[in-house]
Amino acid sequence: MNGNIKKINNVKPVNIWRKVIIRRENKMKKKVIALVLTACMVPVVSVGSGVDVMAAKGDSGDKITLNWQSYDSYDKYQKVIEAFEKENPDIEINFEEVSDYATKILTEATAGDLPDLINCNTGTTQILANAGALQKFDVDALKADTEYKFDDFWDAAERYCTYDGDWYSLPLDGGNYGWVYNVDMFDKCGIEVPEDGFTWDEFTEACKTLMEHKDELGIEYPTIINDMSSAIDTMYPWITEAGGSYLNDDGTCGWNSDETVTAFEYVKSLVDEGYVPAIEKLGDGYYALITKFNAGQIAMCRVALWNSTYLQDDVNWKAMNAPRANDGTQAEVLFLNGIGISSSCENPEAAEKFIKYLTSEEGLALYLEDNTSPQIAVRQSQADLSVSMFDESHDMKLFNTGLEYAGYIDLTETFADQQTIIGQCFDEIWHNDADIKSTLDGMVDQLNSLLAQ
């Protein structure tokens, strides 16, 4: 994940994607398919199924053009595109960077003029797949291709790229959160960072020690727990570590459980003890903590991988594993982007050929090696490429090992609306001192209505 994901979040996709689903429901009532593909009604087929759709344009010998729209810039993919086109002179990739990406995709979907290739950030695969805008990938065929090495993808990718048990996008890039600390400050206080990360009790004790040396260190607080642009990002790790699950076995929301309450109570205890300031929204939620960390105002902080290059080298800092529950349960947030093929693509085999190259070891190596913005390597075998721009002294490889415990809530087609409800209810707890349990109960009632759709 990088700043590009943030850019899409800032577009506020909630109402936009909700319109896609609402239109789908309205059309279904009229016995019309999910999206209004007025210009070209193409059935959703399984990519890699062997359907010879390329013959429609391929017989003439004309070059196939695949239109690709993305929230990213062209230079991010330029080397991969050029390498693919050199190996495949019969296929041309027409790349277009779109600023208001979600709005444009909606407009094109309702007009039946979707691009062939669609970037899918966290939660978007499920929304577009449910709306009928994406084609399925034949995963059995991908796994059978030994050169592609499908099983090299991190296991976590399945949650982000599938809908209703089928793969509608393939993993491309992303980013997770981790923690960094000021080595000099910790050394002055005699604090040793456990290899596996602080337990909650150890984290509290470290905060206490840092506060006892506050004046000597020149800090305002040991750390800050920022209410990020998404409330889910802030609390997901703590809730998961406490033993909470977003979904129960019956598909209802479980974020009003005793474990969820315990997570809120623990974070609130850090505030009550004066170890962190009151939970608030600082700036856009991404750069604010790094700015304070660089200035020596806090001794440790949570950092998104895609913003970690803003950590200054004149500060003696290192990465550390995320805090973990006293029983060892550990969690962090992972965002993962995929790329899919639109349901209106007339050349899905050519599109799949490009996507397979882009997400192959060769393609991802070209993509990651010179990328100035850190991205996770979606393939386990390429993990070191994601943090190759950092000096080894910063221990940034911990962001790779952190993928073993990083994840996110279960993603469904109503994710955007769920995100809004969660944010509103968490705000009531943090900013209006609302009762934790009753607020979570009310939140779950609303979420269950969405989950039942």
Model-flagged regions — what are they?
Residues 320, 369-424, 428:
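Long, aromatic- and glycine/proline-rich binding clefts that accommodate carbohydrate-like moieties
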Residues 61-72, 91-96, 117, 168:
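Short, well-ordered beta-strand elements
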Residues 86-87, 92-94, 110, 189, ...:
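Extracytoplasmic/periplasmic substrate-recognition and gating elements
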Residues 83-153, 187-190, 291-292, 299-300, ...:
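Extracytoplasmic "Venus flytrap"/periplasmic binding protein-like
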Residues 122-178, 318-320, 385-391, 397-400:
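Hinge/lid segment of periplasmic solute-binding proteins
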Residues 164-172, 177, 202-254, 268, ...:
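Extracytoplasmic/periplasmic solute-binding protein
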Residues 206-207, 250-282, 313:
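Glycine-centered hinge/linker elements that transmit conformational signals in sensory
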Residues 107, 116, 146-185, 324, ...:
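A structural signal for short loop-to-beta-strand junctions that line the ligand-binding cleft
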